[in-house]
Amino acid sequence: MAQYSAQFNQAKVLVLGDVMLDRYWFGATNRISPEAPVPVVRVQENEERAGGAANVAMNIASLNVPVQLLGLTGLDETGKALTTLLQTQKIDCDFVRLATHPTITKLRILSRHQQLLRLDFEEDFKNVQSTELLTKLENAVKNFGALILSDYGKGTLNDVQQMIQIARKAKVPVLIDPKGTDFERYRGATLLTPNMSEFEAVVGKCDTEEDIIEKGLKLIADIELSALLVTRSEKGMTLLRPGQEAYHLPTEAKEVFDVTGAGDTVISVLATALADGRSFEEACFLSNVAAGIVVGKLGTSTVSTIELENAIHGRSSTGFGIMNEDELKVAVQLAKARGEKIVMTNGCFDILHPGHVSYLENARKLGDRLIVAVNTDDSVKRLKGETRPINDLPSRMAVLAGLSSVDWLVAFDEDTPQRLIGEVLPDLLVKGGDYKPEDIAGSKEVWANGGDVKVLNFENGCSTSNVIQKIRELKD
């Protein structure tokens, strides 16, 4: 499947559905309240994330694809906070704001990685007139390659049949993540993406693969779908279409930490790929890979183009390969939660030689994960002179990504990685050569966090300068 790509240059996706804001309060619980037999949580930090249809839009934006989001919110602080959060990710928000309803908000209180309580602030929109929302859809849909209707049963999709007909009239495929057991209301959609529980609640118990295929094809015929994608957790996913063989994909998940939002990821990647002109098979393959990535993260999460590209090309077995700083921080947080020891080193790695390979292998043996921070081309030029680097950053990163000792690669543009090391805070900082530990960039930050710093020896006679000199001598 290496010919598949996570670059969606032609895609534009429109999302309409139940938007909500997920709020998280994290704190310590060290005592019971004297007022009632409940724990007292001393809140230490909080976080806000887009939920529902807004998380679908976030998933699409993380793939560097233009996305517009339509939905209903209140005229309140929460609605403004949600809009601001989405706009920072370059999502075009066009909401109908209602003075009669609050923005749907879910507040979760957590301590020691356990959810203690969830507070829901909502009043469903089932009695709200959809005229303004339908007008917005009619004006916008013709400019997009796919429409996602994200149904969380909150009432935004009251007039879902009219929405489907508007999209069909514009010849835009409609993908729906369904809710409830009344699938008749989705008649005429291009594709539904129920999970196995939702599917069986509608068609009945499926004991065999044949049952899934037979009942799925009957459902397609009954409600006039073009296709049906049943997501089956650890059993992968199955695509069904009239007159064609079932297309089954085994799960891509290596480790499962949280399935929150996995369905949003599936439909987001699926719609993006179809909007980019990909086949159903390729779109399903890509969404399956993306789901395998996102369930390895905590909470409602998204998948980036880099993560998806790495996984497609088989680089996920050594971590997530090449990452940006934000992705690296998430990966490190998850690894530390699993009790893994993080080792970090850095360098230019202009011309990779046996000394580099041996050094990185030795560094990797000191922990469970190895991060390699690599100087950008401008950074190398400032340090080594105008004739360097010999190999540009993408080339250097690609070669390093091929080493089994390297888990994660990240670029930095400063002269030293001190800032980056101070933000990542590895358990062990490693540097090769004749440095004193206290002179290594980032050592003070690592020590202050309780980590350690170690100097490793390079192999004698192995250096990039020596390699360059030999090449020059041969040229002369």
From Swiss-Prot:
It comes from the Bacteria. Keywords: ATP-binding, Carbohydrate metabolism, Kinase, Multifunctional enzyme, Nucleotide-binding, Nucleotidyltransferase, Transferase. GO terms for biological process: ADP-L-glycero-beta-D-manno-heptose biosynthetic process. It catalyses: D-glycero-beta-D-manno-heptose 7-phosphate + ATP = D-glycero-beta-D-manno-heptose 1,7-bisphosphate + ADP + H(+); D-glycero-beta-D-manno-heptose 1-phosphate + ATP + H(+) = ADP-D-glycero-beta-D-manno-heptose + diphosphate. Coiled coil: none annotated. Pathway: Nucleotide-sugar biosynthesis; ADP-L-glycero-beta-D-manno-heptose biosynthesis; ADP-L-glycero-beta-D-manno-heptose from D-glycero-beta-D-manno-heptose 7-phosphate: step 1/4; Nucleotide-sugar biosynthesis; ADP-L-glycero-beta-D-manno-heptose biosynthesis; ADP-L-glycero-beta-D-manno-heptose from D-glycero-beta-D-manno-heptose 7-phosphate: step 3/4. The keyword Disulfide bond does not apply. Its EC number is 2.7.1.167, 2.7.7.70. ATP binds at N195, M196, S197, E198. GO terms for cellular component: cytosol. The active site is at D264. Residues 344-476 are annotated as: Cytidylyltransferase. It holds the Pfam family PfkB. GO terms for molecular function: ATP binding; heptose 7-phosphate kinase activity; heptose-1-phosphate adenylyltransferase activity; phosphotransferase activity, alcohol group as acceptor. InterPro entries: Bifunc_HldE, Cyt_trans-like, PfkB_dom, RfaE_dom_I, RfaE_dom_II, Ribokinase-like, Rossmann-like_a/b/a_fold. The keyword Nucleotidyltransferase applies. Residues 1-318 are annotated as: Ribokinase. Homodimer. Catalyzes the ADP transfer from ATP to D-glycero-beta-D-manno-heptose 1-phosphate, yielding ADP-D-glycero-beta-D-manno-heptose. In the N-terminal section; belongs to the carbohydrate kinase PfkB family. This is Bifunctional protein HldE. It comes from Mannheimia succiniciproducens (strain KCTC 0769BP / MBEL55E). The gene is hldE.
